[in-house]
Amino acid sequence: MNQTLIQEILEVVEQAAIASAKLTGLGQKDEADAAAVEAMRLRMGKIEMKGKIVIGEGERDEAPMLYIGEEVGSGNGPGVDFAVDPCEGTNLCANNQRGSMAVLAASDTGGLFNAPDFYMNKLAAPPAAKGKVDIRNSATENLKILSNCLDLAIDELTVVVMDRARHKGLIKEIRECGAKIQPISDGDVQAAIACGFAGTGTHCLMGIGAAPEGVISAAAMRALGGHFQGQLVYDPAIAQTSEWADYTKEGNIKRLNEMGITDIDKIYEANELASGENVIFAGSGITDGLLFDGVKFEKDCTRTSSLVISTLDSTCRFTNTIHMKDGAKSISL
């Protein structure tokens, strides 16, 4: 992995965001996702690398592109593993709501946890709280610790939680402590990363979301120096999702064992979910969000707002790019 790869990966998420944004607000979530997938795959194919999708759009028989195990890139150069979500928050994009983005994590070969398509209990917090808050604690305990770490009163803290029935008890506990809740309907990657930046008004992410996106969040937080922990959820009674209506706890445990995951209750730290020597996170807004704006289409150009965090050079880059159209006559600042 090298510095050139950082710029190329930025362009990958930019192109995916632009493709998806053309369908923003049209109620076509599957089409928006497909457009992002195609654009991301096309740009990846131009990179000098031996790339491999380890977290993607599904198994080979479920997805035509960016499926798990697919090789991407020229086939020459460094080995790079990718966890991708070309249109994170497809519902958000379809309904023109905040928080949708094109996102990926990259690392050296073998450097990303091959998360199954399960759920994951997550805890994300700022760098000041790294190693101090713990997912094993109650929400009450973690809020007290976070309050001390950030030198803020508990009633000054805001916790992001997915708006799901399974979080009813968690939300009640957080509010009883005096902290504020910021509910989100979809897409917890941007919310997790926002915890790593002061001034976002977001101090913590708690609760259950998708496991693959947990790996992407972990990669970003590892590169940023923030706190992230995840624990796989395999009990349908805890996940409380219609997607698992026909699944059983015993069946899910068997699935995990077949994938080679025998310590099913293991709590993963960020550096275990993203363990490679080099880790890159890249995200580009499709719609406006906590960290950056969505795609803006103008007469002579298209504007993208993106974020790249890298351990390669210990940088965090917020990038605004103007993609000029042929024959552009006037570009405004």
Swiss-Prot record:
Listed EC numbers: 3.1.3.11, 3.1.3.37
InterPro entries: FBPase_class-2/SBPase
Family: Belongs to the FBPase class 2 family.
SUPFAM superfamilies, per database record: Carbohydrate phosphatase (SSF56655)
Keyword Nucleus: no
Enzyme class: hydrolase
Keywords: Calvin cycle, Carbohydrate metabolism, Hydrolase, Manganese, Metal-binding
Protein name: D-fructose 1,6-bisphosphatase class 2/sedoheptulose 1,7-bisphosphatase
Cofactor: Mn(2+)
Record PANTHER family: FRUCTOSE-1,6-BISPHOSPHATASE 1 CLASS 2-RELATED, FRUCTOSE-1,6-BISPHOSPHATASE CLASS 2
Coiled coil residues, start to end: none
Chain sites annotated for binding substrate: 88-90, 119, 164-166, 186-188
A biological-process GO annotation: gluconeogenesis
Assembly and oligomerization: Homotetramer.
Function text: Catalyzes the hydrolysis of fructose 1,6-bisphosphate (Fru 1,6-P2) and sedoheptulose 1,7-bisphosphate (Sed 1,7-P2) to fructose 6-phosphate and sedoheptulose 7-phosphate, respectively.
Native source species: Prochlorococcus marinus subsp. pastoris (strain CCMP1986 / NIES-2087 / MED4)
Residues the record lists as binding Mn(2+) 1: 33, 57
Pathway(s): Carbohydrate biosynthesis; Calvin cycle
Residues binding Mn(2+) 2: 85, 88, 213
UniProt keyword DNA repair present: no
One function term, GO molecular function aspect: fructose 1,6-bisphosphate 1-phosphatase activity
GO CC annotation: cytosol
Reaction(s) this enzyme catalyzes, per UniProt: beta-D-fructose 1,6-bisphosphate + H2O = beta-D-fructose 6-phosphate + phosphate; D-sedoheptulose 1,7-bisphosphate + H2O = D-sedoheptulose 7-phosphate + phosphate
Origin: domain of life: Bacteria
